[in-house]
Regions:
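S-adenosyl-L-methionine-dependent nucleic acid methyltransferase catalytic domains
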Residues: 1-305
């Protein structure tokens, strides 16, 4: 309970006040936090070029999973998360050496370090490196190093055991995850990622990208063909490749079953000469039957006249 003037001399209130004062004293101790790279500089040109290029990519891109209206470029998300977690070399040095004036050698070192970190970002944002473990691990190493530096700077903080655990990286939570670019890239960079959203479509997208695949990471496919093949050659089920193989297998099975049951409702169309007159691109296919990509359905009503 809260203490009032009437019972302010009770032993409980004395203890309660001491607890409050102790908690206030602990939280009043400042956390030493070097500026992050994103607060100082980023290779924006490289990030912008990669983000623009990404718009034309379809195969293997999360945008093909389901439509989302405000997707953020994965390249930009990856670069921003990296920049938010990695310490700026200059400010780190100033935190480690308070009151000392830097010399020319120090400044030269900072310039070289920033250039090195920029190179990591420039490699990181390339679409071709999205699954390149060498590039991703180089970024993860820098993130872990910065966390270790922050833990060392705050090792004497009263709450260091809880706030600065060397063995537990900070997690990332995107409260309005939308298309899932931020939590997906955080997960790719080795962080424990959490996503939430008010829109059920966004929730489903994020479940399909960051919640379900990790549960099956490194596990083999379980469909019948995979079990048969496993006895001959044991495949290497890296990441969620086993889950992906199952999705492909059972997706094809569902398509084949649908073809058997309702395929007659969607017949192939015979390309005629008349059709080719309006569509010259169909001329090579005159006399053949082609699969229709889209059907337009319309209700028909018998005319009363």
């Amino acid at each position: 309970g809260l203490c009032t003037e009437l019972d302010s001399h009770s032993p409980f209130c004395d203890g309660h006040s001491a607890l409050l004062e102790g908690a206030h004293a602990m939280t009043a101790i400042q956390i030493i936090s070097p500026k992050k790279l994103i607060e100082v500089a980023l290779p924006l040109d490289a990030i912008n070029i990669a983000a623009a290029k990404e718009k034309s990519i379809r195969h293997g891109h999360p945008s093909t999973l389901h439509l989302w209206w405000a997707r953020r470029p994965l390249a930009a998300a990856r670069a921003v998360i990296f920049g938010q977690l990695v310490n700026d070399p200059e400010d780190l040095w100033r935190c480690q050496n308070p009151g000392i004036e830097p010399n020319r050698q120090h400044r030269g070192h900072w310039t070289r370090e920033r250039a090195r970190l920029f190179k990591i970002i420039e490699d990181l944002v390339q679409w071709e490196n999205t699954t390149n473990e060498k590039v991703l691990e180089a970024a993860r190493v820098e993130i872990r190093r910065s966390w270790q530096e922050s833990c060392e700077l705050n090792k004497h903080h009263p709450l260091a055991t809880d706030l600065f655990d060397l063995d537990k990286m900070p997690g990332l939570h995107d409260p309005f995850a939308g298309g899932g670019a931020i939590p997906l890239e955080a997960q790719r960079l080795g962080l424990e990622a959490y996503a939430s959203d008010l829109n059920p479509v966004a929730v489903l997208i994020n479940k399909g990208m960051i919640e379900i695949p990790p549960k099956f990471s490194g596990l083999p496919a379980v469909h019948p063909d995979a079990r048969t093949a496993r006895t001959l050659v044991a495949p290497d089920w890296k990441g969620a490749s086993g889950l992906a193989d199952d999705v492909r297998h059972f997706g094809q099975w569902m398509r084949d079953e649908a073809e058997k049951r309702i395929g007659h409702l969607y017949p192939k169309i015979l390309v005629t000469k008349e059709m080719a007159l309006e569509r010259p691109d169909l001329k090579p296919f005159v006399g053949t039957r082609l699969t229709v990509l889209a059907w337009l359905w319309a209700r028909t009503v018998k005319s009363p006249s």
